[in-house]
């Protein structure tokens, strides 16, 4: 298994990439995914890393980098390869290769367990929206 910076724009805009990344999107649609990726491609502070296993991409992580800190915009692993440590390896390897001092993320109840397993500390916050409140977590992992 290898984790690499993905610069293949055709793949990033593909339905294969969307099928992996959709699990970390709110109400995912392929059109919305493509629009987000196109925005990221125009932002030099955003990088996309993928996990490749025997030539097949099984996970991806989108990061916004600022000096020695990164914020996870999204991280996802293909359905059939979940719970095998791919997400954790994405975080660890990117932290090493990009020489990061810390990685931040914001998540919900569904994913907080993943971040805990990866060693992130967390702060529980409640966000108020017109249609109700939502519990979110600000997570941080230090080198």
PLM regions: where:
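Conserved beta-strand in the GNAT
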Residues: 50, 56-64, 69-76
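Short amphipathic alpha-helix that is part of the acyltransferase structural core
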Residues: 1-35, 50-52
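Short loop/turn motifs at secondary-structure junctions and domain boundaries
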Residues: 39-45
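Conserved acetyl-CoA-binding loop-helix of GNAT-fold acetyltransferases
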Residues: 77, 83-96
